[in-house]
């Protein structure tokens, strides 16, 4: 049975995409799929934490939200919860926790926390309950991220056994997860007649827009496989991080 991905590849290259065979790649596909599920779960929990902080203490969310997946932030939330628990713990205890997990930014993180706490003088309804919920969410997120790390180690071990792994991981911005996904989707590339066919299929070859009266130049193609679009964004963020 042809999947939409297979149909798209045939349309782009004129060559059918053959299924990747082998026990190793079959196991790799299971691990990569599970890692994708864990990534979605981690995003969901992160958004839940940030949403809860926003509802009870917006300033604290601005201080912790962008760094919510950092081990120091998760440990602080896990032990002391929300605004009331953080203030009760005190600066010294939070600094001890933060510097253990983030030696360089620990003190600055605690300063940001207490600066945020001081900007809000009212207690919003639900703050007490948040002190109970936030540690549980932080623990769940820590466990999910740890599972992703463990799965990534297994993926890397399997990927190292493939002859194309060195080529893939040598490309700027491509790590273990992205390399594994590319390998699963395009195989060894033998299904594509030329590199240009593969580039067209992946949506990275420029397309010239022509009409009956003009040529508008070359632009990125509007269509490409969803997996490739997601990976391109991930690579770009890794290679050109936000300043």
Where are each of the predicted segments found?
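A detector of single, family-specific signature residues
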Residues: 1-243
């Amino acid at each position: 049975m042809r999947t939409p991905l297979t149909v798209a590849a045939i349309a782009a290259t004129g060559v059918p995409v053959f299924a990747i065979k082998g026990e190793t790649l079959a196991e790799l596909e299971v691990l990569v799929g599970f890692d994708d599920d864990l990534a979605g779960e981690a995003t969901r929990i992160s958004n839940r934490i940030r949403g809860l902080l926003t509802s009870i203490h917006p300033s604290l969310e601005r201080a912790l939200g962008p760094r919510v997946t950092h081990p120091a932030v998760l440990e602080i939330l896990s032990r002391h919860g929300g605004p009331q628990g953080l203030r009760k713990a005190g600066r010294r205890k939070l600094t001890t926790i933060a510097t253990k997990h983030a030696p360089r930014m620990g003190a600055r993180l605690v300063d940001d926390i207490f600066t945020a706490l001081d900007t809000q003088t009212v207690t919003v309804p639900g703050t007490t309950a948040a002190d109970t919920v936030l540690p549980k969410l932080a623990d769940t997120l820590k466990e999910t991220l740890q599972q992703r790390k463990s799965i990534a180690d297994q993926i890397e071990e399997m990927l190292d056994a493939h002859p194309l792994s060195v080529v893939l991981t040598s490309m700027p911005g491509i790590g273990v997860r992205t390399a594994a996904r590319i390998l699963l989707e395009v195989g060894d590339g033998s299904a594509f007649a030329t590199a240009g066919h593969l580039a067209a299929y992946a949506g990275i070859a420029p397309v010239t827009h022509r009409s009956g009266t003009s040529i508008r130049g070359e632009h990125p193609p509007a269509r490409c496989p969803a997996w490739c679009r997601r990976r391109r964004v991930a690579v770009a963020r890794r290679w050109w991080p936000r300043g």
